[in-house]
Amino acid sequence: MSFGSEHYLCSASSYRKVFGDSSRLSARLSGPGGSGSFRSQSLSRSNVASTAACSSASSLGLGLAYRRLPASDGLDLSQAAARTNEYKIIRTNEKEQLQGLNDRFAVFIEKVHQLETQNRALEAELAALRQRHAEPSRVGELFQRELRELRAQLEEASSARAQALLERDGLAEEVQRLRARCEEESRGREGAERALKAQQRDVDGATLARLDLEKKVESLLDELAFVRQVHDEEVAELLATLQASSQAAAEVDVAVAKPDLTSALREIRAQYESLAAKNLQSAEEWYKSKFANLNEQAARSTEAIRASREEIHEYRRQLQARTIEIEGLRGANESLERQILELEERHSAEVAGYQDSIGQLESDLRNTKSEMARHLREYQDLLNVKMALDIEIAAYRKLLEGEETRFSTGGLSISGLNPLPNPSYLLPPRILSSTASKVSSAGLSLKKEEEEEEEEASKEVSKKTSKVGEGFEETLGEAVISTKKTGKSATEESTSSSQKM
């Protein structure tokens, strides 16, 4: 094998010693990464340029390594020494270039490791964000449940307040009815008192009339006694006169006049006695009738007074009972009014507390929604960065694998075409320049295609991540599928470009 192939195999073996074989490198590079989009784009540009420079330098070294001395017998030792020095210089330059490329590739791999570390940190943060995004649902459920409980309590308080208002209205109507009844009873009591006063006046009049009648009866009795005394005196005088006249007549004509005088006296006495009896009977009858009338009036007045007193006593008892009942109802009404005021104050305080709680919960919900939207935007940005890094890493991996495949196939074909120990094949400078231009143009075209694919992937990811609120898992699955498709298309394009070169 020639010097260029040995040098390439040595470089490839040094790559494998430092970074492992291609399978481990591809597995390590295929992991997700995370960083800012600006850093990833600058890294992709620098790495694509370094890859293109590495490809051109490797192809140039390959072409120069396979140059052989011309097969002329007249080559002197000075030309051989010049060729040897030229080969040494070229080899030294190639070693320096490969060393620089190795250093740059090591820096690139270190950056990849850093990106992997950042990717793991971002994945942990994404898991935390998902967990935090899953929490607001429970917060919403708790908020809805507490809101339902508060609404139920508010409805219970409203129903209790309505019931208390109905009871208050009923008690107010009862108080109005009792107040009207009390006023009616008061009016009845006043009428009874007026009637009692009138009856008392009548009783006083009857008493005065009875006293007057008693005085009249006493005067009549005195007059009757005086009349009787006068009558007795007159009768005695008349009898004395008659007796004197009879004695005188007896002296005149005792025998003839005695029977007639006795009969006359008897008749006069009988007349006076009948007149006195009639007067006494008439006086007694008048007194008895007057006394009966007065007794009847006094009995009626006494009965009326007794009924009035009983009625007054009954009215007083009813008034006292109604007063006690009114006082009790007034106290109950005042207590109910105080309870209603306390209920209204407590209800107002509870409603204010519930309103404050609802406002606090709504503000918390708005904050949670804004925080969720911010986390969704951060997640979308991180997902865009992750997709861009996945695309870049997949493109770099495919480019490296394609370069390794191209160099290995190119070295084998050249070694198979030049089996002689001293081949006289020399690559012309035109072929070397065309190869370098093809490599650089392929690198630029690949870079442009990669940028276009990255823009398309970012647009696709931005379109898909706009629906993150509907489902994180669905968006993530679609992004992974699009990443795989993009990596596959990049692999196919890099393979086709390597085959064309």
UniProtKB/Swiss-Prot annotation:
The keyword Glycoprotein applies. Residues 441-501 are annotated as: Disordered. Residues 1-87 are annotated as: Head. The modification N6-acetyllysine is found at K290. Residues 488-501 have a biased composition (Polar residues). Residues 94-407 form the IF rod domain. InterPro entries: IF_conserved, IF_rod_dom, Intermed_filament_DNA-bd, Intermediate_filament. Keywords: Acetylation, Coiled coil, Developmental protein, Differentiation, Glycoprotein, Intermediate filament, Neurogenesis, Phosphoprotein. One of its GO terms (molecular function) is structural constituent of postsynaptic intermediate filament cytoskeleton. The keyword Phosphoprotein applies. Residues 263-408 are annotated as: Coil 2. Residues 143-238 are annotated as: Coil 1B. O-glycosylated. One of its GO terms (cellular component) is Schaffer collateral - CA1 synapse. GO terms for biological process: cell differentiation; cellular response to leukemia inhibitory factor; intermediate filament cytoskeleton organization; nervous system development; neurofilament cytoskeleton organization; postsynaptic modulation of chemical synaptic transmission. Residues 130-142 are annotated as: Linker 1. Forms homodimers (in vitro). Forms heterodimers with NEFL, NEFM or NEFH (in vitro). This is Alpha-internexin. The lineage of its organism: Eukaryota, Metazoa, Chordata, Craniata, Vertebrata.
